[in-house]
Amino acid sequence: MKIFFLIMAVAALGLGGCTAAHYYERQSDRVTFYLQAPGAQQVVFACSLDEYNPHPAGKAGDSRWKVSVTAGSEFRYFYIVDGAVYVPDCKFYEKDDFGSRNCVYVPE
């Protein structure tokens, strides 16, 4: 019985860290980005598709934000959360000209 509870405790701890703070979903020629930003008042998405023009994200739940863009090719992106640049954990990164990095979206 102790082994069962130990296994369940380890599984619960492992699953607790699986909540993604950032992910995307592709729908034909568009991609929708989601960002978990608890307490944020404003989230903006900026990408290289249009020279980093701001795309205001909309609320998609209590602390989740979403924004959709056309996605036919690879592009770089980041978020601005309450006025501060935020680069989430991404599969692909690229250094920018300012000593930081941007996420890179690569169509699958």
Language-model regions, residue ranges each:
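Positively charged n-region of N-terminal signal peptides that target proteins for export
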Residues: 1-4
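Aromatic-rich carbohydrate-binding modules that target alpha-glucans
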Residues: 24-74, 82-108
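Domain-scale selection of a single, long terminal region
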Residues: 6-10
